[in-house]
Amino acid sequence: MKKSNLDLLILLAKAGGIEKEILTTSRELSKMLNVSPQTIVRWLEDLEKDGLIKKSESRKGTLVTITEEGVKFLEKLHEELSDALYRGIIIGEVVSGIGEGAYYVRQYAPLIREYLGFDPYPGTLNVRVIFPKTIFDALCNVRPIIIPGFTKEGRTFGDVRAYRVKIDNIEGAIVIPSRTIHPPKIAEIIAPVNLRKTLNLKDGDRIRIKTL
């Protein structure tokens, strides 16, 4: 694919141009993008004209920084690409839990059956979210099913938000209790089967989760 000034803007961002002013030369940038120094000069002028960068000349080269408008442009581009590539998709790695999932799934099992329509395997599959950044980012546009809390033997169990998902054609749900000890990078998944055994998963395996 033919290079453009967008490639240059991304290169400047990766070089630290968002956080600080960076010193570079057209020759150095031309080698990195495999274009002529004259092309780099023209692209820098175009980016400056569009308000995406600020630049000034020094004896050692060109000082460049990405403007606030440039940062907003890159953020918007990132959002649009993410939406196009990963719409409804969560990428994560299987991790071990602390062993409490089975207890809580058993307590909520009748309500899971009522609200989600399946008898859950007594345990959860824990997944560390790689993309998007957190489980909350992944589910922000998905409507949850609220499993109501209850009291049992003097103990209170809070509401749980459940989000229907599919992993390798097995339907289940990501569950987020109103009280949780897990960081926002961890997704707890319930299903009618033992997902680890059924899908032959081990810690570190990467999986793709589709929201429904």
From Swiss-Prot:
Residues 88-212 are annotated as: Riboflavin kinase. Its EC number is 2.7.1.161. Mg(2+) binds at T124, N126. It comes from the Archaea. It is an enzyme of class 2 (transferase). Residues 1-87 are annotated as: H-T-H motif-like. Pathway: Cofactor biosynthesis; FMN biosynthesis; FMN from riboflavin (CTP route): step 1/1. Keywords: Flavoprotein, FMN, Kinase, Magnesium, Metal-binding, Nucleotide-binding, Transferase. Pfam families: CTP-dep_RFKase, HTH_29. FMN binds at T180, E188. CDP binds at G97, I98, G99, E100, G101, A102, V193, N194, L195, R196. It catalyses: riboflavin + CTP = CDP + FMN + H(+). SMART domains: HTH_MARR (SM00347). InterPro entries: HTH_MarR-typ, RibK_CTP-dep, Riboflavin_kinase_archaeal, Riboflavin_kinase_CTP-dep, Riboflavin_kinase_dom_sf, WH-like_DNA-bd_sf, WH_DNA-bd_sf. One of its GO terms (biological process) is riboflavin biosynthetic process. SUPFAM superfamilies: Riboflavin kinase-like, Winged helix' DNA-binding domain. Binds 1 Mg(2+) ion per subunit. Its cofactor is Mg(2+). One of its GO terms (molecular function) is magnesium ion binding. Disulfide bonds: none annotated. Catalyzes the CTP-dependent phosphorylation of riboflavin (vitamin B2) to form flavin mononucleotide (FMN). Belongs to the archaeal riboflavin kinase family. This is Riboflavin kinase. It comes from Pyrococcus furiosus (strain ATCC 43587 / DSM 3638 / JCM 8422 / Vc1).
